Design a protein with these regions (language model features):
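Selective transmembrane helix interface/packing segments
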Residues: 1-84
Length: 84
């Protein structure tokens, strides 16, 4: 059971990281996020980024919550890899 969870997380974490990178890029291309790709990426990443945004608000026009989410996912990935 533990190996299955480690394998699942080792696949899920990079996918979430790519989705967050996609969200960052889409925020520059389509700030309103009205197309379907932007909405899907936002729905995937908001459960991770939303709580961070509540703890650390934007500074001016800069939202650092995606970067913090990437940092935390990276730490989680290191923990998962060391457990496996």
């Amino acid at each position: 059971m533990g190996d299955l969870l480690i394998r699942f997380l080792s696949i899920l974490i990079p996918i979430l990281e790519l989705a967050i990178f996609g969200r960052i890029i889409m925020s520059w291309i389509d700030p309103g996020g009205q197309n379907s790709v932007s909405r899907i990426i936002r729905e995937i990443t908001e459960p991770i980024i939303g709580p961070i945004r509540k703890l650390i608000p934007s500074v001016g026009m800069f939202d650092f919550s995606p970067l913090i989410a990437l940092f935390l996912l990276n730490i989680l990935q290191q923990v998962v890899l060391s457990a496996g």
